[in-house]
Swiss-Prot record:
Weakly or not expressed in absence of infection. Upon infection by D.coniospora, it is expressed in hypoderm. Also expressed in perivulval cells when D.coniospora spores adhere to this region. Expressed in hypodermis upon physical injury. Keywords: Amidation, Antibiotic, Antimicrobial, Cleavage on pair of basic residues, Fungicide, Neuropeptide, Repeat, Secreted, Signal. One of its GO terms (molecular function) is neuropeptide receptor binding. Induction: Upon D.coniospora and S.marcescens infection. Upon physical injury and osmotic stress. Transcriptionally regulated by the transcription factor sta-2 upon activation of the innate immune response to molting and injury to the adult epidermis. The modification Tyrosine amide is found at Y29, Y39, Y47, Y55, Y63. Residues 1-22 form the signal peptide. It is found in: Secreted. Belongs to the YARP (YGGW-amide related peptide) family. Disulfide bonds: none annotated. It comes from the Eukaryota. This is Neuropeptide-like protein 29.
């Protein structure tokens, strides 16, 4: 059974995906993988160049240039 919250999240992601497609010309990738409602060059709501909500250049919530929450490079 798909919950209402899951449907809402999918709808929001779809809307952001379409907005990114219109802005960058290609859904999801555009400028440095900047789709899915990402801010700047982030993905999945990431801020800056991070992925999955990461801040800066980190991945998966990493802060700075680290990966998987790493700090530093």
């Amino acid at each position: 059974m798909i919950s209402t919250s899951s449907i809402l999240v999918l709808v929001v992601l779809l809307a952001c995906f379409m907005a990114a497609s219109a802005q960058w010309g290609y859904g999801g990738y555009g400028r440095g993988y900047g789709g899915y409602g990402g801010y700047g060059r982030g993905m999945y709501g990431g801020y800056g160049r991070g992925m999955y909500g990461g801040y800066g250049r980190g991945m998966y919530g990493g802060y700075g240039r680290g990966m998987y929450g790493g700090w530093g490079k």
